[in-house]
């Protein structure tokens, strides 16, 4: 079980931003910007290559809700995901980073 699965199961605490039945968003413990959030599906998906178009549409809507809640929609932000170890993916569970446009 990876660290994100342990967070989903409640075995590891996190600073939740938003949660619904399919997704969870929380603050990154090693922020790279003033605002650095993660968005993960509760379903076990290794990376972006494993997501279905339907789930991606739902995740996109959830990400928009998180951005609104963080108050960074108008100020600008970065949205990224790393796919595979060679691209820098450290946790083998699909996750998106939301980073405010300003540097930490």
UniProtKB/Swiss-Prot annotation:
Domain annotation HIT: ranges: 3-104
Name of the molecule in the record: Uncharacterized HIT-like protein HP_0404
GO BP terms: D-alanine catabolic process
Membrane-crossing residue ranges in chain numbering: none
Short motif Histidine triad motif, span: 93-97
UniProt xrefs under Pfam families: HIT
Organism in which the protein naturally occurs: Helicobacter pylori (strain ATCC 700392 / 26695) (Campylobacter pylori)
Any one GO cellular component localisation term in the record: cytosol
GO MF annotation list: adenosine 5'-monophosphoramidase activity
Domain of life where this protein originates: Bacteria
């Amino acid at each position: 079980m990876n660290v994100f699965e342990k967070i989903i199961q409640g075995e590891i605490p996190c600073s939740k931003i938003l949660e619904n039945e399919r997704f969870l968003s929380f603050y990154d413990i090693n922020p790279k910007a003033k605002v650095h959030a993660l968005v993960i599906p509760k379903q076990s998906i290794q990376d972006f290559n494993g997501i279905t178009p339907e789930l991606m549409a739902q995740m996109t809507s959830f990400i928009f809700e998180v951005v609104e809640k963080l108050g960074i929609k108008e100020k600008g932000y970065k949205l990224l995901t790393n796919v595979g170890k060679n691209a820098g993916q450290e946790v083998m569970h699909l996750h998106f980073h939301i980073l405010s446009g300003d540097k930490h």
